[in-house]
Amino acid sequence: MKTNKKNLGISIGLALAIAAPVASADILFWSTQAKPVQEAQAMRTEVLSDYSEGVDYQPNDGGPWQTRLQAELQAGSGSISVLGALHGDFSALSAEDLIDLDDLGVSSASTTFNDLAKLGTADLQYIPWMQATYIMAANKKALAYLPKGADIDALSYDQLIAWAANVHEATGEPKFGFPAGPKGLKHRFFQGYLYPSFTDGVVRTFASDKAVVAWDTFKELWAHTNPASTNFSFMQEQLLNGDAWIVFDHTSRLADAFNERPDDFVAFPAPAGPEGRGFMPVLAGLAIPRTAADVDAAKDLIAYMLKPETQIATLRATGFFPVVDVELPNDLPASVIATGAAVAKMSASADANPGLLPAGLGSMGGDFNRVFVDSFERIVLGGQDVRTVLNDQKKALSKIMKETGAPCWAPDAPSKGACPVE
């Protein structure tokens, strides 16, 4: 009888355990962003702590992020509710694996970003979340030499060249500064700014006639560029020491200039070419996998993340800028206020033409960058014929694309399979 009583007790215990109400689990926010310990903690304590429900924020590298997501998708169910990742991460997924988010009623202030977030479909597959990018900055002394009628927030490449030429003539020194040093991010300028602005592509249009015009235009700008730019890597240094009055760089590499002498410098959008205002956004978004346990709860969290006050809290936590219209508070660092305004103007401009970060290249990302750096060194520094160099470098680029099988990314037209170098 003892044995029977014991079994009966176990059975009753199991039944009670099954019948007992289970506390709802926190919403799992599975992200590739804000991974450093300090940023992740700030996301939990400063961004998500005011949300009405519990959120389990879990940042991971791209590999583990993708592995768990794919496992849940294959299983047909899972615990991930909200995905946070870069545009390139989402573009590698099938749109069928994400919940359409058009009915959410929130989106970014940038029509361009919202179009990207549709991933080639008719509906939003992710909601733009936050952004970082590269911009222009200038010493306010240079403003007196702007070409007549030029709007610093809507410059063309021709106006930028004329401006640099005016400063050159007035000071007797070439004062445009470019991060062409060993650790400079020059390749991102060519991939995300020059090529989209002049060719409306990067890979397909690499050796096009429009690309020849792009390089010829950059050579004109180089004539008014401080020749020591081949040693420049963080343009904040040249702004502060006066070696350059007009510069291009990543927002983080301009920060010291604005924080140390905020009244001396101005930030503004990159210039536009014949094909629009090319710029390279590091665009992160939020999505919901089709296997999410509670889609409504996930949608509510995404809506919360797009609130202006949440976007500002995210900026403080991560250094990434808002994608919605917000008025930045005065207690932010001077660099954030100055560069944030320029980023917002650039991404929301009517002629914005984003050149996205290269995607799908794996370990050959460095080889891809080298194609553009080699082209710069041969054409601009070495004075070689543009057409000859592009035809030569085209072979190296084509080999990389075929070996990786990487499909095209914006602004190149989509491809089935490896992006062709036309």
Tell where the protein language model's regions lie, with residue ranges:
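Extracytoplasmic "Venus flytrap"/periplasmic binding protein-like
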Residues: 27-28, 45-112, 144-147, 245-246, ...
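Periplasmic-binding protein-like
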Residues: 39, 141-142, 171, 304-327
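Long, aromatic- and glycine/proline-rich binding clefts that accommodate carbohydrate-like moieties
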Residues: 32, 117, 317-378, 406-422
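Hinge/lid segment of periplasmic solute-binding proteins
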Residues: 86-135, 159-161, 266-268, 422
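Extracytoplasmic/periplasmic substrate-binding proteins
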Residues: 30, 189, 216-297, 420
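Extracytoplasmic "Venus flytrap"
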Residues: 26-44, 360-364
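Glycine-centered hinge/linker elements that transmit conformational signals in sensory
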Residues: 161-168, 201-232, 258
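Extracytoplasmic/periplasmic solute-binding protein
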Residues: 123-129, 134, 158-203, 210, ...
